[in-house]
């Protein structure tokens, strides 16, 4: 996902959907901006090597947003997600599962891992 922004793909990727709390969209714009700025500073100041992408998914599925994070190692992905649990923004998350995490593989490697009929 970060490669869409011109960043080289990392070896590990985590993708998950999420839905904001019902009251999130009733907060003043300034408050939401403040909360999200603090949330971003919290995670990416400690994990600047982790690259993230956010996709709005309103009306396309059961989720409002889809997030993707990429890192060179699995522990960096786990670290940033765990670190982000301790922010005010977490008070405004209704659902943020399921998580899909895996290492980057080539299409050939992926095909070779598939069950044979």
Give residue ranges: language-model regions.
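Residues that flank catalytic or metal-binding motifs in active/ligand-binding sites
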Residues: 12, 63, 95
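Terminal substrate-recognition subdomain of acyl/acetyltransferases
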Residues: 104
């Amino acid at each position: 996902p970060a490669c869409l922004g011109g960043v080289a793909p990392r070896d590990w990727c985590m993708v998950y959907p999420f839905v904001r709390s019902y009251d999130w969209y009733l907060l003043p714009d300034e408050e939401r901006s403040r909360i999200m700025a603090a949330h971003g500073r919290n995670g990416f100041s400690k994990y600047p090597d982790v690259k993230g992408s956010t996709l709005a998914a309103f009306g396309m599925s059961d989720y409002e947003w889809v997030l993707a994070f990429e890192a060179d190692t699995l522990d960096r992905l786990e670290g940033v997600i765990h670190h982000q649990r301790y922010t005010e923004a977490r008070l405004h998350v209704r659902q943020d599962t399921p998580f899909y995490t895996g290492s980057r593989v080539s299409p050939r490697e992926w095909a070779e891992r598939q069950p044979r009929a």
